[in-house]
Amino acid sequence: MSAIFEILDKDAGGRIGKLRTPHGVVETPTVMPVINPNIQLISPKEMRSFGAEILITNSYIIYRKEELRTVALEKGLHELLGFDGPIMTDSGSFQLSVYGSVEVTNEEILGFQEKIGSDIIVPLDIPTPPDVHFRRAEEELATTAERLEAARKFIQSKQLLAGPVQGSTYPELREKAASHLKDLNFEVYPLGAVVPLMESYRYAELVDVIAASKKGLSPTSPVHLFGAGHPMMFALAVALGCDLFDSAAYALYAKDGRYITSNGTYHLEKLNYLPCSCPVCSRYTAEELRKAKNKEELLGRHNLYATFAEIRLIKQSIKDGKLLELVEQRCRAHPKLLDGLKRLYTHSAWLEQFDPATKGTYFYCGPESASRPEVLRFGKRLERFSIEGSAIIRTSPVKGEKDYDRILTFKAPFGTFPAEMEEVYPFNAEVPKFPDYEALSTSLSNTIKLMDLNPGAEFTFICEKEFQHPLIEEIGKKAKLVYREAWKKE
């Protein structure tokens, strides 16, 4: 594990950790509010009251403005912003992505960040946007790699150095870049050029980008999802292993009259009620907030409260082993997020290696739950069950079951397991009485696999009338199939 990053708790790919910086320890996952040195809707010194432990600002903006540059060089970045905690600085890559060029070299901006006392320094990488030609992505990635290698040699202080992972929307390039950077031993790994994906709600592709990058990195490396600032997607990103986010959304949305919640965004002009109990929403009605002279500031404050409330809920969900339940709730807030959830579970085999072997009770939240890592793990371990003689499979106790050599329980979405394990994780799962098609598909497939692994056993399967699924016919070829109603009459 990295000397500067300690993992305390885990669930799925998410983790609670401690990131050590020159200006203190930060608990992750967390959000870094973006501070514009020229325009401060809410002062940096107030950020701690919302829950902020670390800020991020743009060193290129400071570098370009003589007044700011002079103060930063003479008194330091922390004095300039009036914040005594950790501060990360971006290098100007955002301006490069927007305007196509910046008036500074990689070495110049690295040296400037080092001199002003940034806690996390970011090199001037090339933010390759989505959907470009593969050759362009590959060429720009090579340029970024050269700059990052130079940065690693250039920065020798105790300040942390970030190694941004680029590669556009090509998972193979993302994983290749991450693997290369891992060998250079950066302290923090931002995932760059993902804002266009989030702005266009391309969450399925975002999931692939994050997963590919994470697969190339050490599992103990802290990961920063650059430009991710809306709380509705934090849980999804955390479940993939992201530890740091940065948010200018609190201010940008406030300027546009938008009200952030963990389930999406409202336009203040259309709100009759404020669905929040933060200090702002507890004091004002929707109408009063609209008429307030400092409406933008108040809205920005609410947006920050909502942002950090979601971070706290995510941390508690990790503690409780309920992160994926939260992810499934959040991803039903928007169809595109649901696409992201479905894509997340295509990576379940990878996630399963990080998911704790035992944790809080599994809750079935919908069809996607049938693809969770816990279910996949069960399917991989069916060979551990050795069954001989007569065996009865049922969802709940039936008359005459003790006449059989083995009593087995069927529970979707898992499948069939020894009845004596019903109260053991994950079989103590809370599931619907009537399983959906996806849950039946997985559980019946696992049951067929169990039967195939134990060809010497004689199975009797007590089927519920609600089990309408093509695989029931296959079960009937391998076991005596009896519907519960018919069993009662025997």
UniProtKB/Swiss-Prot annotation:
Residues reported to bind Zn(2+): C276, C278, C281
CC cofactor: Zn(2+)
Tagged with keyword Transferase: yes
Family: Belongs to the archaeosine tRNA-ribosyltransferase family.
Role played: Exchanges the guanine residue with 7-cyano-7-deazaguanine (preQ0) at position 15 in the dihydrouridine loop (D-loop) of archaeal tRNAs.
Cited PANTHER family: QUEUINE TRNA-RIBOSYLTRANSFERASE
GO biological process: tRNA wobble guanine modification
SUPFAM superfamilies, per database record: Pre-PUA domain (SSF88802), tRNA-guanine transglycosylase (SSF51713)
Protein name as annotated: tRNA-guanine(15) transglycosylase
Record key words, sorted: Glycosyltransferase, Metal-binding, Transferase, tRNA processing, Zinc
